């Protein structure tokens, strides 16, 4: 088919998703700044099981434990300020969490290119559907 050239964003698989998210965040955890690559994971903000896609703006590079806490509702990211939200459940459930409470309200690291920043709609979904205030 002949027509106007169009920019197409390729759909990424999980490995490609992880690679582009790692690159976007300079191989640093968006929350802790950790750079130990084997411990870093590309987290989906809107999970694939909830119709989320392997899109760079649906990803955060997180240290493995931070990823688990994000998925299990202990951590969230405010969609407008991009600040870390920490659930009171962390202290209630485990009597701990000082590392994260000390970071509460701080702006998480953003990707190197502004166009790769986390999608606000996806962050709102996570705060509304997953995060436990």
List each model region and its residues.
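Internal active-site segments that recognize and position negatively charged phosphoryl groups
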Residues: 1-33
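A detector for short metal-coordination/catalytic motifs
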Residues: 2, 12, 16, 34-40, ...
């Amino acid at each position: 088919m002949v027509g106007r050239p169009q920019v197409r964003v390729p759909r990424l698989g999980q490995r490609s998703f992880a690679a582009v998210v790692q690159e976007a965040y300079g191989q640093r955890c968006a929350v802790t700044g950790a750079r130990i690559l084997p411990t870093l994971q590309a987290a989906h903000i809107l999970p694939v099981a909830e119709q989320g896609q392997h899109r760079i703006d649906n990803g955060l590079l997180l240290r493995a434990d931070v990823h688990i806490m994000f998925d299990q509702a202990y951590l969230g990211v405010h969609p407008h300020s991009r600040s870390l939200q920490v659930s009171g459940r962390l202290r209630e459930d485990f009597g701990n969490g000082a590392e994260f409470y000390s970071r509460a309200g701080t702006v998480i690291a953003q990707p190197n290119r502004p166009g790769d920043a986390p999608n606000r709609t996806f962050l709102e979904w996570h705060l509304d559907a997953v995060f436990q205030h």
